[in-house]
Amino acid sequence: MNINATLIGQSVAFLIFVLFCMKYVWPPVITALQERQKKIADGLDAANRAARDLELAQEKAGQQLREAKAQAAEIIEQSKKRAAQLVDEAREQARVEADRVKAQALAEIEQELNSAKDALRAQVGALAVGGAEKILGATIDQNAHAELVNKLAAEI
């Protein structure tokens, strides 16, 4: 292999080309590659953060859903207790009203019974006086009659 001036000229030209590329071409290419690498790393970090945020949001949503279900169950339980309480109160009021109506009816019955007894006593007294008049054949004095009726009514 012959080393001649052409080979030396080509080597010098190649060396100048390499130096030119290292000085003017290579730094922008390296900078562009570093920027691209940084953008890719930032994108991956953002994707990881988004995945973590999504997972946290899903956990939070699940927790809120469980809390809402628990609150709903508690509200339903309170409603059932309140309904049972209202039913018990209504039953108690109905029982009190029934007792009042029963007492009033018993009082009316007692009053009517007493009225019937008084009327019956008066009729029995009149019948007794009438029967006595017929037996004796004479009328009895009015004062004596009233006294006998009262005595008879008291005995009855």
Curated annotation (Swiss-Prot):
It holds the Pfam family ATP-synt_B. Its main location: membrane. SUPFAM superfamilies: F1F0 ATP synthase subunit B, membrane domain. CDD domains: ATP-synt_Fo_b (cd06503). The keyword RNA-binding does not apply. InterPro entries: ATP_synth_B-like_membr_sf, ATP_synth_b/b'su_bac/chlpt, ATP_synth_F0_bsu_bac, ATP_synthase_B_chain. Disulfide bonds: none annotated. One of its GO terms (molecular function) is proton-transporting ATPase activity, rotational mechanism. The chain crosses the membrane at residues 12-32. It is found in: Cell inner membrane. The keyword Hydrolase does not apply. It is a single-pass membrane protein. F(1)F(0) ATP synthase produces ATP from ADP in the presence of a proton or sodium gradient. F-type ATPases consist of two structural domains, F(1) containing the extramembraneous catalytic core and F(0) containing the membrane proton channel, linked together by a central stalk and a peripheral stalk. During catalysis, ATP synthesis in the catalytic domain of F(1) is coupled via a rotary mechanism of the central stalk subunits to proton translocation. This is ATP synthase subunit b.
